[in-house]
A protein has these predicted regions:
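Short, flexible/disordered intra-domain loops and linkers
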Residues: 65-77, 140-145, 278-285
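Conserved kinase catalytic-core helix
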Residues: 87-91, 131-178, 223
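Conserved short submotifs of the Hanks-type protein kinase catalytic core
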Residues: 120-132
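Short Pro/Gly-enriched beta-strand edge/turn motifs at strand-loop
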Residues: 13-20, 213-225
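Active-site acidic catalytic loop and adjacent metal/ATP-binding pocket
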Residues: 29-48, 56-57, 216-264
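Active-site activation/catalytic loop segments of kinase-like enzymes and analogous catalytic loops
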Residues: 83, 263-286
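Active-site catalytic-loop/activation-segment of kinase and kinase-like phosphoryl-transfer enzymes
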Residues: 159-221
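Conserved NTP-binding catalytic cores of kinases and kinase-like/nucleotidyltransferase enzymes
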Residues: 1-121, 243-248
Length: 286
């Protein structure tokens, strides 16, 4: 992946490349993400941003998965995320009512959209800070986080997600249309195929592999018919980071749209369970 972020920003912002420093961000599976730092800070008022900033985050979305270039991946994912960042920004004119949760829970953050270059497939958003760590890494770090910090963050996250699901439950077709949100159904289908194909590879040689993978396919199709809501869809531990102020930051809204309450809670719960077992604090008899 050799997209030239420096040249792109230099042309867009009309500043010399020497004022831009690019730092690759780790963890991206489907997109390439970088932090661009500016000396001096760059003026973004022409994009509706109220102030100059020392840094921004950019995401480039090629028509394939960045970590597996041989796997095609619809670039509509970036259009979905760009629209989601507007809908979830409580200061946006197009904000959804549920965006008020970011005001109600000020310790829960999400990036704000600065600019979306549809032709170049580049998304520019606010930087939530360089001193961030994913929630799974934060929970197992040494020395461990203070119990009161863990309790506060867990409470804020649980209440925020619970209220988000309730506030967006059973979204109507009319509402989804009014959101002007690209449909995430195609991406979900691609994701299901990717999971099933990987499962077949992992289970090669296992008896009844076709029966097992068919059950996974059926479950992926059927569960979305129940408990519908709006959601991140891809809600897991790597999409939740903790910054230096111990705020929760929710990242990667590229699947945002019609979802399922059980999926939203179950996927995240599964990853927290894996974190729990990785701590080696339970015995096989417990």
């Amino acid at each position: 992946m050799d997209f030239d972020f420096t040249t792109h920003l230099s042309k867009l912002l009309s500043i010399p490349p020497s004022q831009i420093t690019i730092q690759a961000l780790t963890g991206g599976l489907s997109n390439a993400a970088v932090r661009a730092s500016f000396i001096p800070p760059v003026d973004l008022t022409r994009f509706g941003h109220p102030q100059s900033v020392p840094s921004v985050v950019l995401k480039y979305s090629p028509p394939y998965m960045v970590n597996e270039p041989s796997v095609p991946y619809d670039t509509i994912r970036q259009d979905i995320e760009a629209r989601a960042l507007v809908l979830l920004d409580p200061n946006s004119k197009s904000a959804l009512p549920v965006s008020s949760l970011f005001t109600k829970y000020p310790n829960v953050k999400s990036p704000c959209l600065i600019h979306h270059d549809y032709e170049e497939r580049v998304l520019i958003m606010t930087d939530l800070g360089s001193s961030v760590v994913t929630i799974d890494e934060w929970l197992i770090q040494e020395p461990p986080p203070l119990p009161e910090d863990v309790g506060r963050i867990a409470t804020d996250l649980g209440r925020f997600l619970g209220e988000f699901v309730i506030a967006t439950s059973k979204p109507s077709v009319e509402l989804l249309s009014l959101l002007q949100l690209p449909s995430n159904s195609g991406l979900l289908h691609q994701f299901d195929e990717y999971v099933v194909n990987n499962l077949k590879d992992v289970l090669q040689g296992v008896p009844d592999v076709d029966v097992l993978t068919k059950r996974v396919e059926d479950a992926a199709r059927d569960f979305r018919k129940r408990d519908s809501c709006l959601g991140m869809v891809d809600l897991w531990s790597k999409n939740i980071v903790i910054n230096s102020d111990k705020n929760l930051c929710l990242l990667d809204w590229e699947y945002f749209g019609w979802s399922n309450a059980s999926w939203e809670m179950g996927l995240l719960g599964m990853f927290f369970l894996l974190i729990y077992f990785s701590l080696d604090i339970v015995t096989p008899h417990e």
